[in-house]
């Protein structure tokens, strides 16, 4: 399939590359993909205006630690989930990192008059505006060690400092209770720990464009995707037909394909993210422009300057 896609690129009519990002009419949400690979994980993206950070996690039961790395071969034992992500998030939220996030901000978020439990969450508004003038921080957590059932409890324990302060967004008594931090599991996150739960303070990165279906647990039980489970829904950019693998500007058929995926996801009140646009691709901005024009919510990128380019005042 990859070879067929690559071969098809050779017959495409060339399209001029965009010179500038478009000016969107709404706040575009930015997600720091492979954030742990930045020179200063979390901090670089936060300073650039990102409020969502991704961690690829490898559980080591002997060390009792999660390491952050894209592959098992590139694990650096000095880089753990604690040191590269959690400690930095805590420093920001406790007001010890940036003048743009003071220690009273979590309290402002939680006590804002319009921050009320709801059974019909507006996730885009939550991410784009937050409450009390404070936007939330998202942790996108991908278990890559292929042991989700074993490692998931340890990951939940690692979030205890956020949980103990009452900062985590949670699903409880049939309603979403918004917090200044939201933890979203992706990749090897076990469905058993998500869909059947009647109370939880973590969420699921659902499959964009496929929310009319169901999620299945290890027992074979099926649960419908819904907005109380899926604040974000993602899909690989190159898995959408006519994507050009993100190597060339989108051809005329691409907008229709992406629009279909986005509309279907929005019907379930989830937000959309397409990942995998190569940071070094000359067509990157064309891809992002097209996604924004079709109504996608998130831009997933490793390039810190992208956020300022689109959300400039």
Where are these regions (language model features)?
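Catalytic cores of phosphodiester-bond hydrolases, prominently lipid phosphodiesterases
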Residues: 19-36, 41-54, 58-313
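Fungal secretory targeting signals
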Residues: 1-19
